[in-house]
Amino acid sequence: MNRVTIRVPATTANLGPGFDAFGCALGLYTDVTFEETDSGLEITGCDEAYRGPDNMAYTAYCAVLASLSEEIRGVKIHIDAHIPICRGLGSSTALLVAGAMGANVLRGNKLSTQGLLNITNAMEGHPDNLAPAFYGGLTASMVEGGLPVTVSFPLHPDWQFLALVPDFNLSTPLARSVLPEQISRADAIYNIAHGALVLKALELGDEPLLRTAMQDRLHQNYRRKLIQDYDAIAALARTNGAAFCLSGAGPTLLCITRSKKLREVLTEKLPGVTRRSWEILPLHVEFQGAHVLESC
C-alpha cells in the first residue's frame, strides 16, 4: 500500500461550560489523500499559502513517521476540505488527525488510536477537539502527566444540531486573548456543576435541562463581544426552545434541539436580528471517528 485517503469529521468543542474538555464529532468532513513518492512534497486542494512543509497534515504525517523511526520520503497530499476554515468547527484538527492516521496506515498501523492522540496532542494541545475527531461521538478529555485521557459519553438519538456559520472568521489566538488570567471560585463551581448536567441532559434528551446547563462563565461571556449580533441570535435560539453555545472558540454558533422546525424558524427570523450573512448547517452527530475511506 502506498496510497490512502483518510476521512475526518468536523468537531465542536466546549459545548458551553465544558471549556477545553468537552467535544463532539459532527457530520461534516475533510478527506485527505496521501501518496508516497520517492522524494519531494506536493500539496494540492488548498490555497497556495498552505502548500508548504508547515501544512498541518504534513507536519502530523512527519511527526508520526519520526515517532516510528521511519524514513520520511516524498509524499503527495490532496486535501478535499468541507469543514469551514477558522470557524470553530475543527478544520485544523481535521488536518492533524488525517496526517497522523495517514502516516500510521501507510506504515502498517503500528500505533494505536491513543498513540496517535498522544502525538497530535503534543503538537496542538487541544484534546477537546482531537478526541472526538479520532473516536467520534461525544467525549470529555483532560491532560494528565502530559498525556490526554478521554472518555466517551452517550447521546440521545433525537438531538438536532444546527451550526450557524458566519461570513467572517475568528482566530483561536484572538479568541483566547480576551479571556481573563484568573477566575473566581464561584465561577469555577458554576462551570463544574453546569458541565456535569450538560452531559446528563445530552444523554437523556432533556431539552429544558440542556438549555439551562449550557450556560457558562469561563469563556463565552468574553468571546461574545467578538461576534456581531451574538446576543440577539442567542435570544432568538433560546426563545424557540434550543440550547445555545459557541462552537469552539467561535465564530460559529451552535443550536441543539429536538425540534425539527428550528431550522425553518431560524431561516425566517435570523435576517431580522442580524445584518451579517449566516449559513445554517443541519448536522448530525458522527459516531465514527477518523477512518480510512479508501486505500491501494
Task: Kindly give the residue locations of the regions a language model identified.
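Gly/Ser-rich oxyanion-binding loop with an adjacent helix/lid
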Residues: E71-V149
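Short beta-strand-to-turn element immediately C-terminal to the catalytic PLP-Schiff-base lysine
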Residues: E35, A133-Y135, T139-E144, C255-R258, ...
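Short beta-strand segments
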Residues: R7-P9, A25, A133-G136, M142, ...
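Solvent-exposed alpha-helices and their adjacent loops that cap or buttress functional pockets
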Residues: T12-N14, G23-L26, S69-E70, G88, ...
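Glycine-rich, charge-dense phosphate/pyrophosphate-binding loop(s)
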Residues: L202-C296
